[in-house]
C-alpha cells in the first residue's frame, strides 16, 4: 500500500545525531511511493554521509547553494518549486533559530524561505538535548516558526545520546511517516469527534483465567488511525491488546465488557461518530473467584454460571444523541456463517444506519480483510485488502453519509 504515491518530498537534514534515523525515514518514504530529494547542511554531513542518503534516495544529494549541477545556480528555487513538501528531520535548535529569524546562510534555509508557502508546506521534526528543547529561546523560536506557517510534528521522549533522559528526541521514522501521510490525507472529518472500540474483552473466572476471543484489535486500530488522518479528534477504547497507539489518538484501555460499556457511554456524550469494532464477550461469569479455581481430584469440572453482558452498541445507539442524529453509529459483526443474513438482522436489531460484516475466523489476527457494508438499501462488498486501506474506505463512506445527512 503506497500512501504517498506521486508526492515529491524534499528531506532536509540538519546537524544532529538523529540524522541516523533520517536514513530509515528516507527508505520508508520511498517505500510509501514518494520520491525523495535529500538536502543536507554542512553540519548534517558530519553525522551521516551524503553517499548514504544518495544510495537510499536514488538521487544526488544537495549540500551547497553553489552546486554546479544547476545551470542557473539557483537550487534553492528549483528544488523548492518541484516539492510537494519540505520535511526537516532532524531540525536542530540552531536551525530552528535560523528559521525564526529568516536567516539564509546555506542552501536548506534558503529553500525554506524561498518555498511558495501556499503550496509547499514545511514540516518540522525537532531533535535536540532535553535542556535545549526546554530552553525558552528554543520554544520561542519554534512558536515563531509555527506562526510563520510551518507544521510541527512534535518530539519523542526517552534516552538520549548524551546519556540523559527526557523530551527532545526526534520521533521514530515510522511515526514521522504516519504524520506525513496524515498531513496529505483529505480532511473529510475535520472538526468531528470519533469514538472507536477495538479488540476483545476479558471476562475473569478467577485471578488467573478468563473468557476472551481471538480479536487482535487491528481493524479498530486501523479505523482510529484513518479517522485521525481524516482530521477527526479520535478516542480509542481498547480491550487487552498489544498494539501501538496510532499517532494523535487518545487511548483508553479497558479489560471487561462492563468497563468498555462505562467508557463508551461516557465518551459517546461528546462524539459525532461511534464505530464499534470491539469483539465484546456476550457472556461473563456470574461470579468471580478471588482465588484460582483448582482441580479437586474428583474428575468433575466446576459448575460455572453465566450472565449476559450488556450490548454496548445497542445501548449507545438508543441514546438521545444517537436518536436525534448527533451521533452516527457504525457496528461490526464477526460471524462464522451466513454473514449477510446475520449482518442484516443485527443492523435492524441494534437500530443503526450502517453495519460492517466480516467472517471472524478469516480475519482475526490478519493484516488484511474483506468487508460487507450493510444498510437499509442493501449490501456492498469491499474486496480483500490491507485493513488500513479498508479503514480509509470506511471512514470516507462515513464522512460522505454525514455530509449528506445520512444519520
Predicted regions and their residues:
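A cross-family phosphate/adenosyl-ligand binding-site feature
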Residues: 1-124, 129-407
Amino acid at each position: 500500500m503506497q500512501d504517498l504515491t506521486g508526492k515529491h518530498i524534499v528531506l532536509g537534514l540538519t546537524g544532529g545525531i538523529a540524522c541516523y534515523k533520517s536514513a530509515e525515514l528516507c527508505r520508508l518514504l520511498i517505500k510509501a511511493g514518494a520520491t525523495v530529494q535529500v538536502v543536507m547542511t554542512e553540519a548534517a554531513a558530519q553525522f551521516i554521509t551524503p553517499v548514504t542518503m544518495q544510495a537510499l534516495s536514488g538521487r544526488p544529494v544537495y549540500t551547497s547553494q553553489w552546486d554546479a549541477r544547476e545551470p542557473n545556480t539557483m537550487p534553492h528555487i528549483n528544488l523548492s518549486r518541484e516539492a510537494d513538501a519540505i520535511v526537516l528531520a532532524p531540525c536542530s535548535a540552531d536551525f530552528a533559530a535560523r528559521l525564526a529569524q529568516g536567516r539564509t546562510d546555506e542552501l536548506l534555509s534558503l529553500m525554506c524561505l524561498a518555498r511558495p508557502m501556499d503550496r509547499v508546506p514545511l514540516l518540522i521534526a525537532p531533535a535536540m538535548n532535553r535542556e535545549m528543547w526546554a530552553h525558552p529561546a528554543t520554544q520561542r523560536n519554534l512558536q515563531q516558526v509555527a506562526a510563520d506557517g510551518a507544521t510541527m510534528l512534535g518530539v519523542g521522549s526517552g534516552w538520549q545520546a548524551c546519556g540523559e533522559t527526557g523530551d527532545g528526541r526526534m520521533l521514530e521514522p515510522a511515526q514521522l511517516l504516519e504524520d506525513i501521510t496524515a498531513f496529505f490525507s483529505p480532511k473529510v472529518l475535520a472538526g468531528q469527534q470519533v469514538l472507536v472500540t477495538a479488540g476483545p474483552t476479558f471476562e475473569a473466572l478467577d485471578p488467573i483465567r478468563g473468557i476472551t476471543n481471538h480479536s487482535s484489535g487491528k481493524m479498530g486500530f486501523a479505523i482510529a488511525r484513518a479517522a485521525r488522518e481524516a482530521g477527526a479528534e479520535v478516542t480509542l477504547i481498547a480491550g487487552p491488546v498489544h498494539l501501538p497507539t496510532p499517532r494523535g489518538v487518545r487511548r483508553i484501555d479497558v479489560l471487561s465488557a462492563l468497563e468498555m460499556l462505562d467508557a463508551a457511554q461516557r465518551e459517546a456524550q461528546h462524539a459525532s461518530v461511534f464505530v464499534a469494532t470491539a469483539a465484546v464477550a456476550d457472556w461473563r461469569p456470574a461470579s468471580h473467584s478471588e482465588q484460582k479455581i483448582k482441580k479437586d481430584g474428583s474428575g468433575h469440572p466446576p459448575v460455572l454460571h453465566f450472565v449476559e453482558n450488556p450490548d454496548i452498541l445497542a445501548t449507545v445507539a438508543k441514546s438521545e444523541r444517537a436518536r436525534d442524529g448527533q451521533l452516527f453509529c457504525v457496528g461490526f459483526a464477526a460471524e462464522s456463517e451466513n454473514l449477510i443474513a446475520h449482518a442484516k438482522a443485527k443492523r435492524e436489531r441494534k437500530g443503526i444506519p450502517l453495519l460492517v460484516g466480516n467472517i471472524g475466523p478469516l480475519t482475526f489476527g490478519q493484516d488484511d480483510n474483506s468487508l460487507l457494508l450493510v444498510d437499509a438499501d442493501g449490501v456492498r462488498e469491499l474486496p480483500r485488502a490491507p485493513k488500513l486501506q479498508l479503514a480509509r474506505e470506511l471512514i470516507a463512506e462515513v464522512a460522505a453519509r454525514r455530509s449528506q445527512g445520512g444519520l
